[in-house]
Structure formats: C-alpha cells, structure tokens
Amino acid sequence: MSVRHRIASSGVFGAVTVAVAGPIAGLGFSRLIGHLPTAGPLSRLAAAVVLYGAGLAAVGVGYLALTGRLGDLRPVRPDAEEVRLVAAVTAVLVLAWVVAVVGLAVLGVPFAGNALTAQADGGFRISLVLLAGLSLVVIAPTEELLYRGVVQASLYDVTSRRRAVVAASVPFALAHVPTLYADTSEPSAVGLSLIAVFGLSLVFGWLHARTDDIVAPTAVHGGYNCLVFCLLYLVGV
C-alpha cells in the first residue's frame, strides 16, 4: 500500500497530524518575519498574519495533495439560500458578541482579547482596520481550509458529522490559547474567551457539515471577524 493510500485510509491519524502540524508550520513561517524588510508595527503585523496563514495553508494543501484530495478545494458557488444563511449567521454571531461584551463589562467579568487586538491597546488602533481586511483574505480562508476543509472533512468517513464538528473545534480553540495569553495572563479570562472561540468553531463546523464546502464557514468566519474589528475601531478600543 502506498504512503498516499495509508494516510488517506486513516482519517483520524490524518486529522490529528494536520491539526498539530498546521499551527507549528504557521509559527515557523512567522519566524521568517525577521528576514523581511518590514518598516513599522503595521507592516510587521500584516507580515506575521500572512506568514502564519501561509503555514496553515501549506500544511492543508500539502495533505490534500498527498492524499489525492486537492479536488475538494474546488469552490462551490453558493445559491441564494446559502447566501441568506451566511448573512443571518454572521448577524447573529456579531449580535451575540455585542451582548456578551456589554454584559461582561456590566458584571465586571474579565475576558481575554488576543495578540492581534493587543496591538490596538498599545496605541495602534489603525491596526484594527488592517485586521478587518486580513480577516477576509487571510485569517478566515486559511483557518477554515485547515480546520474544516482538512481536519473536519477527514473525520467524516470515520465518525458522525456531529462528532467531527466537535473534534475539529478542539484543536481550533487550542491553537488560539497562545494569542489569548498574549493579552492577559489571567486564567479565568483566558478560559472564558477560549469557550467563546470553541463556540464559534462549532458554528463554523456546523456550516461546513451542512454545506459540504468551506465557502460558507469562511464567509461567516471572515465576516464576523471583520465586523468585530470594525466595531472595536469605531468605539475607540
């Protein structure tokens, strides 16, 4: 049996391997920033995001190529129903975020941001606008490619779709732990935000399981992140 067939026949092994290798490759690619002619904090931020995303994409595309599944990346043009679904889910998620942030602030409950929004806290508010754009073209596409298009999809043949959604959401959430700790070292705040990230991942995973394509989860993921960053900029965070 060839390497390709051995890997393809083990959905769990492939999913775990990709889930671990993706963030490692992303961090490895990010280290290349020291060799790039970045002029300031904004260009360094953009380079870091792009390089990390390139690492995720390299692992995801590499695995699909190795297993003969590159055809899975062919985008499916969404129909009117899917467009309405994307718009509705994005609106609900953003509204839920607003309610949660206001509610936690009123109750005085701390929660963690991440290493990206920490730049805005450091006086670079314009970075939020940059991140809004990067969410649409880099962050959401590469994360959804890896965690939904590869990890979750690889589990469909070995377990139920519901379990695949949950299983793929675990490494997605854990991959965000370092960025959450970059904003605060308070364990309870990090834990609360980690639960929120896990919840978001469940929604993205549900969309993939429903549509069998990464277009819908990518659109919702990117739209949600973009709108949140824009709202943070508008309120002066």
Task: Pin down the residues of each PLM region.
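Residue-level signature of transmembrane alpha-helical entry/exit and packing/kink sites
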Residues: 6, 10-15, 44-52, 81-89, ...
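Transmembrane helix-loop-helix hairpins at the membrane interface
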Residues: 128-237
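Alpha-helical transmembrane segments
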Residues: 10-25, 87-95, 167-171
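Juxtamembrane helix-loop-helix connectors linking adjacent transmembrane helices
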Residues: 37-44, 70-140
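Membrane-helix interface segments in multi-pass membrane proteins
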Residues: 25-50, 105-114, 182, 186, ...
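Alpha-helical transmembrane segments in multi-pass membrane proteins
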Residues: 13-67, 119-123
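Short, Lys/Arg-rich, polar N-terminal cytosolic tail immediately upstream
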Residues: 1-8, 71
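Structural signal for membrane-spanning alpha-helices in multi-pass inner-membrane proteins
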Residues: 26, 30, 59-64, 97, ...
